Amino acid sequence: MSFDSIPILDLSLARNEETKPAFLRDLRHTLLEVGFLYIKNTGIPETLISDVIAQGKAFFDLPDEEKLAIEMKNKPSFLGYSRLGMEVTRFKVDWREQLDLSTPHPMPGPDDPLYYNLLAPNQWPSTPGFREVYEDYMTRMGKMSIEFTSLIAEAIGLPADAFDRFFDASQQHKLKIVKYPDLAELGVEGEAQGVGPHKDSMLTSYLLQASHHRGLQVQNHEGEWIDCPPIDGTLVVAVGQGMQALTRGVCLSTTHRVLSPARGAGARYSIPFFQGVSYDATFESMDVPESVTALRDEVQARRGAKQDDVEFTFRPGQWDHLGSATLYNRIKSHPDVGEKWDQYPEILAGIRKQHAQQGHVSEALPSG
């Protein structure tokens, strides 16, 4: 039997010693069976959430010249504005417009590893109040995400600080502000890919659904797509491939996608926050208690072979450092940035060679 809805967990229960054990049991069940959940009562002020949404939507109303002044390909950091259709997932164009931000870092030095290019200052729009709102939100979300990963650790029988070694000065939380135009604006009949089927990369990510539109879908174990509609007062949490690898498959990373809004529905907005880890770290599986791995084996045996549109690709030991893996994935998703900066052509050529050997051809990005 596979899941047919996404569970909702109340984070305030984890902050009360009397209700915390029940919360951890529910969290463990969700990690093993679903890998996707809503959380409510996060502690992020509602006034800040409202400001984040308002400022995010207003950004896309800026004149094109103001947005292009902070275009992603202006810098080798993969931070900044991406025009409609400039990102690729599973060799197809994602029909979305977005701004990528991160927690603050100074410019990398000349002797730093290449992946330190990712650790750089943001390109900020000039909108009054925008930077202050988003810096506040990212700071609060960073703290909350570390709290949540400590709860994941406890839920699967590890010490609360089991993941702390992945958080240091080269840790970079990331955030996207995303606009998905509807099919009428795109001039498309039927369906369009807002973002293609994928699994998130690292530990956990937290999505603020910033408009009333449906579109986010999660793939269950039978291959069916389950709606994950907006629910007021919640964030959607996705378990990343890194978390699945670290926990020996106990925490499930689940495939998800976004469909473009229907004709006449207007644009959908979302603001995902991606918990970062140290780019200098390597991933090695943790010693998860046998009682929990036995539960994992029981769940896997019960549900049988998993039908999944996206293969699990995160392999411990595949990369010298997590930063190298992250840089590779950024170049893969944003080939226009990879083409522009002379540090990246060898990596981009390797990606394209691998795709050609596998018989894949990526859709062409829009010109301009």
From Swiss-Prot:
Database matches in InterPro entries: DIOX_N, IPNS-like_FE2OG_OXY, IPNS-like_sf, Oxoglu/Fe-dep_dioxygenase_dom
Binding site for 2-oxoglutarate: R268
Biotech uses: FR901469 inhibits the activity of 1,3-beta-glucan synthase from Candida albicans and Aspergillus fumigatus. With minimal inhibitory concentrations (MICs) against Candida albicans and Aspergillus fumigatus of 0.63 ug/ml and 0.16 ug/ml, repectively, FR901469 displays greater inhibitory activity than other 1,3-beta-glucan synthase inhibitors such as, WF11899A, echinocandin B, aculeacin A, and papulacandin B.
Keyword Transferase: no
Keywords noted in UniProt: Dioxygenase, Iron, Metal-binding, Oxidoreductase
SUPFAM superfamilies: Clavaminate synthase-like (SSF51197)
Recorded GO MF terms: dioxygenase activity; metal ion binding
Domain Fe2OG dioxygenase, first and last residues per copy: 171-277
Keyword ATP-binding: no
Pathway membership, UniProt: Antifungal biosynthesis
Residues that bind Fe cation: H198, D200, H256
Biological processes annotated in GO: small molecule biosynthetic process
EC class of the enzyme, as a word: oxidoreductase
Protein EC: 1.14.-.-
Family affiliation: Belongs to the iron/ascorbate-dependent oxidoreductase family.
Function noted in UniProt: 2-oxoglutarate-dependent dioxygenase; part of the gene cluster that mediates the biosynthesis of the antifungal antibiotic FR901469, an inhibitor of beta-1,3-glucansynthase, exerting antifungal activity against the pathogenes Candida albicans and Aspergillus fumigatus. FR901469 is a cyclic depsipeptide containing 12 amino acid residues and a fatty acid chain. The NRPS frbI contains 12 modules responsible for the formation of the depsipeptide backbone which is denoted as Acyl-Thr-Ala-Tyr-Val-4OHPro-Thr-Thr-3OHPro-threo3OHGln-Gly-Thr-Orn-OH (C71H116N14O23).
Protein's name in the database: 2-oxoglutarate-dependent dioxygenase frbJ
Species of provenance: Dothideomycetidae sp. (strain 11243) (Fungal sp. (strain No.11243))
